[in-house]
Amino acid sequence: MSNQEVDFQAAHLESPMKMSPSKVSMNHGAFMANMQNGYSPTREGATAGSSSTRVIEALHAQIDSLTKTNLDLTVQSNNLLSRLESSNNTQSKHLESISTLKHENDNLGLMLSRKERRVRDLEQQLSQLKHSYEEAAMDNKTMRHQLQTSGQREGTLENQLQQLQVQYDALVDGQKRYREKYDLEVEELKKSLQDFKRDNEMYLTKNIQTVVSNNTALQTKINQYSGKYKNLESLSQQHMQELSREVEGMASKLDLAKWEKLYEESRNMAIEYSEKTNVPLSPSFLAQHGAKSGSRSPSTSSSSTFVHPSQIRVPKVRHSSSSAKRSSFYGSNVSVPGGTVPGVKQPSASPTTPSSGGLPGVRRSSSVRGSSSSSRNSSGDLASAESAAQSQKGASKNSANNKKKRMSSHSYSKSNGFSFGEP
């Protein structure tokens, strides 16, 4: 054999072909059967030629050695293939186990992460529980203190309750006694009230006729008095109207400007007399009449010395001249007082002036008509003193008549035995 063939076979021996274990086992079974039977394909052709016997035998020896080597290698290969197959199975199992373990490892990693999160959550819960425990411990301590305080207060309240119970029992007993006492008093008052009602009914029954008769008589007297009062009121109105007409008529006949001129002259004469004789005038005279003023206008004097018509008495001499009036005013039997001027308020007393009646022909009257003063004009409408005196006399007569009527009615009621009190 050449070296190439040996190298080729050695290469084939060094790197056997990859065969499946099933095919190797089938060829290996046939080869092993031929080897056991002593069958060799080269031995059949050895008889053909004697010259190449040695070469053939050498080749047969090599073939046998190679066959043996092949057989050993086949056995070894078979063993290796079986081992490879078992290794492949083991590897596949290991791969499966590795994948399973990887999956389990992933699962365990996820579980570990979940457990770690759970641990962190539990740690937070533990911290919260610790905080809650501390708060609960503080609350428990506070509650214990409050419990002790409440126990002490409960004891105090129990003592107070016992005291109040004793006081309440005493009040109930006192109320019961008072109730019994007041029930008896109420019963007595009811009996007294019933007796009083019965006596009052008897009294009213006895005196009802007297009350009715007195009421009838009283109503009759009231009606009579109303009629008399109406008649008296109508008469009074008529009298006042008549007086008003008379006063207006007398005031229309009076010359006010002449009386003002007389007043100015008399006042100036009194002041001149006091200056000539050095006799001081009274302060009341000066306060009422003032100083000497001959240049006063009639309008000013009339406004400042306005006299009510009822305060002036006109002299009885009619149609006389101013000289006659002046002579009668300055007569020897007439004195000029300082404080009796018409229309001016009179003082109480004057030490330097005589207390005569006033100016001649003028007399004060107590009856004053307020309604007639509003109807006077600035031309000097003043009433006469005679009308004022007549009105005063008429008013006094009416008042006297009214008094007589009242006295007669009062005496009549007394004579009849009628009274306004209880019968």
Curated annotation (Swiss-Prot):
Compartments where located: Endoplasmic reticulum membrane
One Pfam family linked to the record: SHE3
Gene: SHE3
Protein name stated in the entry: SWI5-dependent HO expression protein 3
Family to which this protein belongs: Belongs to the SHE3 family.
Keywords associated with the record: Coiled coil, Endoplasmic reticulum, Membrane, mRNA transport, RNA-binding, Transport
Recorded topology in the membrane: Peripheral membrane protein
Function comment: RNA-binding protein that binds specific mRNAs including the ASH1 mRNA, coding for a repressor of the HO endonuclease. Part of the mRNA localization machinery that restricts accumulation of certain proteins to the bud and in the daughter cell. Required for the delivery of cortical endoplasmic reticulum into the emerging bud.
Protein's organism: Lachancea thermotolerans (strain ATCC 56472 / CBS 6340 / NRRL Y-8284)
Lineage, top ranks: Eukaryota, Fungi, Dikarya, Ascomycota, Saccharomycotina
UniProt cross-references to InterPro entries, sorted A to Z: AH/BAR_dom_sf, She3
Principal place of residence: endoplasmic reticulum
BP GO annotations: endoplasmic reticulum inheritance; mRNA transport
Region (Disordered): 284-423
GO-annotated molecular function: RNA binding
Skewed-composition ranges (Low complexity): 293-304, 320-332, 347-380, 391-401
Coiled-coil region(s): 101-260
GO cellular component, as recorded: endoplasmic reticulum membrane
Comp. bias regions, Polar residues: 410-423
SUPFAM superfamilies, alphabetized: BAR/IMD domain-like
Top-level division of the source organism's lineage: Eukaryota
